[in-house]
């Protein structure tokens, strides 16, 4: 049974079957490992030190340093569990090794044009790496799923809340 301190859905990606692959680029995997290392080896020891110091002051019920420190430790431990589980399940896919560069696959940078001649460039990455503001979309997103397997010149139908729209694939690039 999960305690209130645990994420109930730490293992899976919400809304997907439990055995869905957890693809990541090498850069995303490295960033996740770096975050885990920083939390476990740098931040957590500092917080433990503050909590130990605060616990030595006596009454813990009104000790803000102690209470905040314990809360922060729970947050760190939750994130560490999450990162470890993700890293254990990660399937690192290096887009630079893609041999079929004429089609859209994981890791591709795709430029497409909307019906109003507006060009958009996106890179298809892992779910944890997605950042729409940076043009990095999850391979699980509706746009990426519509683009996967397409070639330059293909017309793709994107379903949007305001209705469907057709876009044409202009360029496909891999690192």
Where are the model-predicted features located?
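Conserved NTP-handling cores and scaffolds of large molecular machines
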Residues: 40-43, 90-91, 151
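Non-DNA-binding regulatory cores of transcription-related proteins
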Residues: 93-175
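Helix-rich terminal scaffold detector
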Residues: 1-81
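Low-complexity, charged, repeat-rich alpha-helical/coil interaction segments
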Residues: 21-34, 72, 79, 85, ...
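Structured, basic alpha/beta domains of bacterial-type, RNA-associated proteins
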Residues: 77-98
């Amino acid at each position: 049974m999960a305690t209130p301190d645990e994420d109930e859905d730490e293992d899976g990606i919400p809304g997907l079957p439990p055995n869905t692959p957890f693809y990541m680029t090498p850069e995303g995997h490295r960033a996740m490992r770096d975050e885990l290392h920083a939390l476990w080896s740098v931040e957590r020891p500092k917080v433990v030190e503050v909590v130990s110091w605060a616990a030595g002051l006596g009454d813990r019920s009104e000790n803000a340093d102690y209470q905040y420190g314990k809360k922060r430790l729970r947050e760190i431990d939750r994130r560490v569990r999450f990162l470890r589980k993700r890293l254990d399940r990660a399937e690192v896919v290096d887009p630079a090794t893609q041999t079929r560069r004429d089609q859209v696959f994981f890791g591709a940078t795709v430029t497409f044009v909307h019906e109003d001649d507006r060009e958009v460039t996106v890179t298809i990455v892992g779910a944890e790496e997605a950042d729409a503001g940076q043009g990095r979309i999850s391979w699980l997103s509706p746009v990426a799923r519509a683009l996967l397997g397409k070639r330059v010149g293909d017309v793709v139908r994107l379903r949007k809340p305001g209705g469907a729209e057709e876009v044409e694939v202009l360029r496909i690039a891999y690192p």
